[in-house]
């Protein structure tokens, strides 16, 4: 409820480290549940996204998820970085949503947009 323009939230797999001081919303019930894509799909119903940040490793290590990101965010600005830079960027997020996802690099930083 406290997400303003340009603020960020992270949706991550179950292995993504949550930076100290960043609130964690832990949805992981068991390996694979809920999935990264299920959680992302629900969040996108209620959030206007201006741009995304994903790790470049996703393209080669998790091509199915990479392809889905390209489809979901076609026309949106995409920040690509290595995984270490991604984790550094997560330190400024308003929250990290931890899923039960167990595929590699299934993580995204969503930058809040505005609806007008």
Walk through the language-model features, giving the residues of each.
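Conserved residues at the C-terminal ends of beta-strands
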Residues: 12, 55, 111
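Short, glycine/charged-enriched secondary-structure capping and boundary segments
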Residues: 24-26, 67-69, 111-112
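Mid-chain, well-packed structural core segment of small domains
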Residues: 41-85
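Short, well-ordered alpha-helical segments in soluble proteins
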Residues: 73, 112-116
């Amino acid at each position: 409820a406290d997400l303003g323009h340009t603020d960020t939230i992270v949706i991550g797999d179950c292995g993504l480290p949550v930076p100290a001081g960043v609130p964690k919303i832990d949805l992981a019930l068991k390996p694979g549940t809920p999935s990264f894509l299920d959680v992302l799909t629900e969040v996108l119903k209620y959030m206007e996204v201006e741009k995304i940040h994903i790790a470049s490793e996703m393209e080669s290590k998790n091509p199915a998820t990479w392809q889905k990101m390209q489809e979901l965010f076609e026309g949106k600005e995409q920040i690509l970085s290595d995984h270490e830079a991604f984790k550094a960027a997560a330190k400024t997020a308003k929250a990290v949503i931890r899923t039960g996802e167990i595929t590699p690099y299934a993580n995204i930083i969503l930058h809040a947009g505005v609806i007008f």
